[in-house]
């Protein structure tokens, strides 16, 4: 799988992920891009799960963003509805972490839309490790969101064999607004 982490702090939301693609116990690729900017750079999205499945969901989510004029919550709910009712989509095994300047959501393979606690999302095989690290850093430091994401991904990569050190990190800075 992979590790995707999102942290919101002090006028920034950041999503980061590693680049490892595995097939069973074999690393197939180390530099996959699993974090993307959508809707003219106003929305961040990261995915964990089967790569082809995740790209399919990412494309569908981007279409929902367009259809709902960039309204993140409406797009997430619309995708989740499709996910639950479309037989082909129900077979896709992936998770999405999405965020804009106002809200963050996890969209699950069961068609659930979850708004996280503590302005923190961590999904994928290394998600629990990254979440633990991020919580500790959020509660005990004044580090910015990007640094917390970087450190959380590093810790997850040191523990999880399905997470590597090749990170893609995207930042939405809305502190000046």
UniProtKB/Swiss-Prot annotation:
Alphabetized NCBIfam families for the sequence: ATP_dep_HslV, PRK05456.1
Keyword tags: Allosteric enzyme, Cytoplasm, Hydrolase, Metal-binding, Protease, Sodium, Threonine protease
GO CC annotations, alphabetized: HslUV protease complex; proteasome core complex
Subcellular location: Cytoplasm
InterPro entries tied to this protein: ATP-dep_Prtase_HsIV_su, Ntn_hydrolases_N, Proteasome_sua/b, Proteasome_suB-type
Broadest EC class assigned to this enzyme: hydrolase
Lineage summary: Bacteria, Pseudomonadati, Pseudomonadota, Gammaproteobacteria, Aeromonadales
Coiled-coil portions: none
PROSITE patterns named among the record's database cross-references: PROTEASOME_BETA_2
Claim: Metal-binding is one of the keywords in the record: yes
Active site per database record: 2
Record Gene3D superfamilies: Glutamine Phosphoribosylpyrophosphate, subunit 1, domain 1
Function: Protease subunit of a proteasome-like degradation complex believed to be a general protein degrading machinery.
Residues bound to Na(+): 157, 160, 163
Entry's Gene Ontology BP terms: proteolysis involved in protein catabolic process
Gene: hslV
Assembly notes: A double ring-shaped homohexamer of HslV is capped on each side by a ring-shaped HslU homohexamer. The assembly of the HslU/HslV complex is dependent on binding of ATP.
Activity modulation comment: Allosterically activated by HslU binding.
Domain of life per record: Bacteria
Its EC number(s): 3.4.25.2
Organism: Aeromonas salmonicida (strain A449)
Family of this protein: Belongs to the peptidase T1B family. HslV subfamily.
Protein name per Swiss-Prot or TrEMBL: ATP-dependent protease subunit HslV
């Amino acid at each position: 799988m992979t590790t995707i982490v999102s942290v919101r702090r002090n006028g920034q939301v950041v999503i980061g992920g590693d680049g490892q693609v595995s097939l069973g116990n074999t690393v197939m690729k180390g530099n996959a891009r699993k974090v993307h900017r959508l809707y003219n750079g106003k929305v961040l999205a990261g995915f964990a799960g089967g790569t082809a499945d995740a790209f399919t969901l990412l494309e569908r989510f981007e279409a929902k963003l367009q259809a709902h004029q960039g309204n993140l919550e409406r797009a997430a709910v619309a995708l989740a509805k499709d996910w639950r009712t479309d037989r082909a989509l129900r077979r896709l095994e992936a998770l999405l972490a999405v965020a804009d300047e106002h809200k963050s959501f996890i969209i699950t393979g069961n068609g659930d839309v979850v708004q996280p606690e503590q302005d923190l999302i961590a999904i994928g095989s290394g998600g629990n490790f990254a979440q633990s690290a991020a919580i500790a850093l959020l509660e005990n430091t004044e580090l910015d969101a990007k640094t917390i994401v970087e450190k959380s991904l590093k810790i997850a990569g040191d523990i999880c064999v399905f997470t590597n050190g090749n990170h893609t990190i995207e930042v939405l800075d809305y502190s000046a607004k």
